[in-house]
Each structure stands twice: as structure tokens, then as C-alpha cells.
């Protein structure tokens, strides 16, 4: 199984930005945590981790997932979650099961964060569970393909 993990703007600043909201782990720590999580270590999952602060690059990543025949996408679009019709449309265009993840509970924060433009294109959203949200997204994609 091939899963592309796409992180959007400012996720490269994990461990530096708003530690009270996002925690003290770095972006590299997050990627290692996902890749090495023991729950699915024996499932032979191939991960590709990508991060960009640029909306168009995120659209390109999603399109590349299609051409590289990925089975699933885990997406934390960061602030673009609330504004990007382009990312929404890219997810719809490729028809790859996509799970949206947010480290913080976006529904318990500022009102503008409660609007999710990208979520309706995804098969699910996990929010507010910290880095564990990514693990749950992987487990869900495994189950999605095993049903």
C-alpha cells in the first residue's frame, strides 16, 4: 500500500510555532513517528512525506499521487483547509481516498477555522488528536482497503 502524506503551510515549523497548540515535536519527528508506528509496521506500507507552503505545489502533489498510483492520501492542508477550492478540486479530480488531518481541534478555535473548504472532498476528517490523528488516518486507510 502506498500512502502520500501531504502537509501544508507552516507545518515545517512544528516544534517552533505555538507549542501550546501544536506540541513540541518537529516536522521530522512527525514523519518518523508516522513511518515507524508499530501498529502497522508489518503491513508493508510505503510512505511519501511532502510539505509545502505554496497552494499550487500542494495541488501538484495531489496530482502526482494519481500519476504515481498512490492508494491513499493523508492531507493536513493547514490554513488552506479554510480557503482552497483548488485543493478541494484536485482531491475530487484524482479520486484517491483522502483523509484530512489537523493536529489541533480546528472546531474549537477561531471562527474562520470552522469553515472547511477541502473537507467535503475527503472521505473523512480527524481533528484535535495531535500527531495521533495521522496514525488513525493510516489505520483507517488500511481498513478502507480491507473492507
From Swiss-Prot:
GO molecular function per UniProt: 3-dehydroquinate dehydratase activity
Similarity annotation: Belongs to the type-II 3-dehydroquinase family.
Keywords: Amino-acid biosynthesis, Aromatic amino acid biosynthesis, Lyase
Function: Catalyzes a trans-dehydration via an enolate intermediate.
Pfam families per record: DHquinase_II (PF01220)
Site (Transition state stabilizer): 17
Active site location: 22, 102
Protein name as annotated: 3-dehydroquinate dehydratase
Domain of life per record: Bacteria
Positions with a binding annotation for substrate: 76, 82, 89, 103-104, 113
Chain's gene name: aroQ
NCBIfam families attached to this UniProt entry: aroQ, PRK05395.1-2, PRK05395.1-3, PRK05395.1-4
PANTHER family for the chain: CATABOLIC 3-DEHYDROQUINASE (PTHR21272:SF3)
E.C. numbers: 4.2.1.10
GO biological process entries: amino acid biosynthetic process; aromatic amino acid family biosynthetic process; chorismate biosynthetic process; quinate catabolic process
Stored InterPro entries: DHquinase_II, DHquinase_II_CS, DHquinase_II_sf
Species per Swiss-Prot/TrEMBL record: Fusobacterium nucleatum subsp. nucleatum (strain ATCC 25586 / DSM 15643 / BCRC 10681 / CIP 101130 / JCM 8532 / KCTC 2640 / LMG 13131 / VPI 4355)
CDD domains (alphabetical): DHQase_II
Amino acid at each position: 500500500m502506498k500512502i502520500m502524506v501531504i502537509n501544508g503551510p507552516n507545518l515545517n515549523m512544528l516544534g517552533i510555532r505555538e507549542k501550546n497548540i501544536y506540541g513540541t515535536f518537529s516536522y521530522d519527528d512527525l514523519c518518523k513517528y508516522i513511518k515507524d508506528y508499530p501498529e502497522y509496521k508489518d503491513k508493508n506500507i510505503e510512505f511519501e512525506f511532502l510539505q509545502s507552503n505554496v497552494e499550487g505545489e500542494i495541488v501538484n502533489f495531489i496530482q502526482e499521487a494519481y500519476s504515481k498510483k498512490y492508494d491513499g492520501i493523508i492531507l493536513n492542508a493547514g490554513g488552506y483547509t479554510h480557503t482552497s477550492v483548488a485543493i478541494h478540486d484536485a482531491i475530487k479530480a484524482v479520486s484517491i481516498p483522502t483523509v484530512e488531518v489537523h493536529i489541533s481541534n480546528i472546531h474549537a478555535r477561531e471562527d474562520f477555522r470552522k469553515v472547511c473548504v477541502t473537507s467535503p472532498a475527503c472521505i473523512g476528517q480527524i481533528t484535535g488528536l495531535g500527531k495521533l490523528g495521522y496514525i488513525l488516518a493510516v489505520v483507517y486507510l488500511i481498513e478502507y482497503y480491507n473492507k
